[in-house]
């Protein structure tokens, strides 16, 4: 058989959310920043994303990242995040997955009891620390990018749920944060269809009404998803949240960048003190922890540096081929 492309991946999940790491088979990516490399991929090789994220190799809620060379002196590697709709600016669960794989598979020099991993992402440089006992990787904590409330108490009108009020905050991506209780939206698997409809309608309305732009990275200029918070199932958790992002994807994890934005939102509203920990529960009951490390500014705006902690596990290795004779080789989505 004639194979037009072969791609190798490491399959990881973070709190239940898939993350497919592409380790080989990509074309050489031109550009001296991750954002420019991402732009080249989007224009010249987007079929790779479709092949790996869409069915039959992936599914409507698939997520992944392409390894690339670092662009800053303190980074071990760079990453370009991909999903069903396109490309994202940040992915906290992806950072945790990448850091776990880097330590488990020896991509970085490992030290006990903790190993540092530096990652260049579209949103900037991210530093992670992985617990390492000499045999196994444990929980990962990463220093998030500066995070902040962009706009408070904004309202959007939706077709199915009426007026929805919340905050737009940034934790590596812009999200619309809303309380699900007034809309009878528990963060449970049984409510996932209503959560998807709600999140998609709010995201569309917010993007139409409230233009956003990162003060220092103008390429980050859209609301990536809706984060719906409600009561957790575990009394030890602070809250549960469900992130509906991209093209109606549902995050199985508590959302890493979303946790960073939530920490900033709560801190800047006086609802989370320095030294306090947000225990953030996902739709499947897994947990990330978030806390404020320090205050900072971004383009003159008050912001904080959050730390986010979670765990990931390698669940497989794969080799994928692209066969141009296959009419579905670049994938499809039923939903």
Swiss-Prot record:
Keywords noted in UniProt: Isomerase
Its EC number(s): 5.1.1.-
TM ranges: none
Isomerase listed as a keyword: yes
MF (Gene Ontology): 4-hydroxyproline epimerase activity
Catalytic activity: trans-3-hydroxy-L-proline = cis-3-hydroxy-D-proline; trans-4-hydroxy-L-proline = cis-4-hydroxy-D-proline
Protein's UniProt name: 3-hydroxyproline 2-epimerase
């Amino acid at each position: 058989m004639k194979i037009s492309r072969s791609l190798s991946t490491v399959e990881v999940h973070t709190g239940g959310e898939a993350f497919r790491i592409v380790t080989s088979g990509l074309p050489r990516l031109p550009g001296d920043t991750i954002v420019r490399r991402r732009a080249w991929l989007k224009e010249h090789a987007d079929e790779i994303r479709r092949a790996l994220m869409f069915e039959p190799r992936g599914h409507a809620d698939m997520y992944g990242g392409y390894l690339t060379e670092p662009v800053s002196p303190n980074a071990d590697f760079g990453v370009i995040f991909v999903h069903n709709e396109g490309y994202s600016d940040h992915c906290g669960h992806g950072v945790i997955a990448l850091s776990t794989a880097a330590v488990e598979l020896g991509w970085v020099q490992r030290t006990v009891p903790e190993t540092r991993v530096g990652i260049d992402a579209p949103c900037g440089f991210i530093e992670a620390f992985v617990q390492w006992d000499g045999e196994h990787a444990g929980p990962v904590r990463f220093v998030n990018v500066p995070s902040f409330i962009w706009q408070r108490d904004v309202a959007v009108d939706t077709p199915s749920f009426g007026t929805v009020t919340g905050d737009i905050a940034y934790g590596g991506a812009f999200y619309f944060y809303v309380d699900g209780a007034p809309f009878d939206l528990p963060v449970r698997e049984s409510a996932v269809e209503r959560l998807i409809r709600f999140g998609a309608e709010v995201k569309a309305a917010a993007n139409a009404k409230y233009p956003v732009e990162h003060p220092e990275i103008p390429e980050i200029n859209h609301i990536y998803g809706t984060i719906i918070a409600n009561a957790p199932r575990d009394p030890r958790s602070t809250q549960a949240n469900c992130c509906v992002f991209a093209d109606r994807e549902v995050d199985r994890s508590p959302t890493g960048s979303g946790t960073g934005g939530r920490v900033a939102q709560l801190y800047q509203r006086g609802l989370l003190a320095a030294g306090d920990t947000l225990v953030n529960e996902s739709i499947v009951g897994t947990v990330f922890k978030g806390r404020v490390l320090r205050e900072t500014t971004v383009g003159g705006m008050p912001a904080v540096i959050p730390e986010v902690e979670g765990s990931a596990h390698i669940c497989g290795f794969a080799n994928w081929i692209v066969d141009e004779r296959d009419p579905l080789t670049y994938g499809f989505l039923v939903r």
